[in-house]
From Swiss-Prot:
Subunit field text: Monomer.
Protein name (Swiss-Prot/TrEMBL): Ribosomal RNA small subunit methyltransferase C
InterPro entries: DNA_methylase_N6_adenine_CS (IPR002052), Mtase_sm_N (IPR013675), rRNA_ssu_MeTfrase_C (IPR023543), RsmC/RlmG (IPR046977), SAM-dependent_MTases_sf (IPR029063), Small_mtfrase_dom (IPR007848)
Location of the protein in the cell: Cytoplasm
Catalytic activity reported: guanosine(1207) in 16S rRNA + S-adenosyl-L-methionine = N(2)-methylguanosine(1207) in 16S rRNA + S-adenosyl-L-homocysteine + H(+)
Molecular-function annotations in GO: 16S rRNA (guanine(1207)-N(2))-methyltransferase activity; nucleic acid binding
E.C. numbers: 2.1.1.172
Cited function: Specifically methylates the guanine in position 1207 of 16S rRNA in the 30S particle.
Alphabetized UniProt keyword annotations: Cytoplasm, Methyltransferase, rRNA processing, S-adenosyl-L-methionine, Transferase
Amino acid sequence: MSAFTPASEVLLRHSDDFEQSRILFAGDLQDDLPARFECAASRAYTQQFHHWQALSRQMGDNVRFSLVAQASDVADCDTLIYYWPKNKPEAQFQLMNILSLMPVGSDVFVVGENRSGVRSAEPMLADYAPLNKVDSARRCGLYHGRLEKQPQFSLESWWAEYNIDGLTIKTLPGVFSRDGLDVGSQLLLSTLTPHTKGKVLDVGCGAGVLSAALASHSPKVRLTLCDVSAPAVEASRATLAANGLEGEVFASNVFSEVKGRFDMIISNPPFHDGMQTSLDAAQTLIRGAVRHLNSGGELRIVANAFLPYPKILDETFGFHEVIAQTGRFKVYRTVMTRQAKK
């Protein structure tokens, strides 16, 4: 986090208005403005582990990562600055949660890129904090309102589920493939053979679909799942529990919290971080896998066919093979050998 996003640059045009404000920053926190903004007090709340990592270096205990905000996160705050994400259900979940805790009369600012659908904030908050557009620049909109009524928020009401091949998949807003199995994961699943053994790490686990499907056919497999998203971590735990499966699930920025080595690493890595295209996570995954695979261990990932992963795989492992493909997706496989760059 260094350069400011367009949304933050729009906020900075109004920085004088916030000098006396006690602000909670939330939503898609793509930069370190919450740590550098001149105001009376600044807190941040995020569902994204990598955003918490970056901000906690400067903000310490004034930034918190969790599935839901708590009363302590909004303590003494009189202003919410919410960065609109590209996922509307995620925005609704977070805003209903946070506004259920903010005191009536609080200032509510929503900022985001026009292409993210930030205009949806107006109808979404109409019953709680009617918004007016106060600025438009850098292809972003900035909206302001005052909290007139706290919404009701119950985490239980936000859970959803679907079924795949007899498995119950539990999910929450903001989790990848919330409404059903995506085509890429489906292709990767088709390559996993029954009776797989050993330790398997599922990076970017989402709702836990890949791990649950693998374990249902391979009861001797030992699962570890991780994701940057708090909703994904909770959804994966719930998916495993719903199907009577066991596994360790935790938040991690790719390998940041991962210990030890594995016999297989599987992933459908993201190539977007919020609204921005980013191959960072996938590059970190491929290059870091050599430090977390046993000798003879395998990395198996699915990706959009146009992404430049073959080059990174070859640079890191010395070779790769395509074991399944469609017009849009490819499943890549490579193995930990002596020629891999550790």
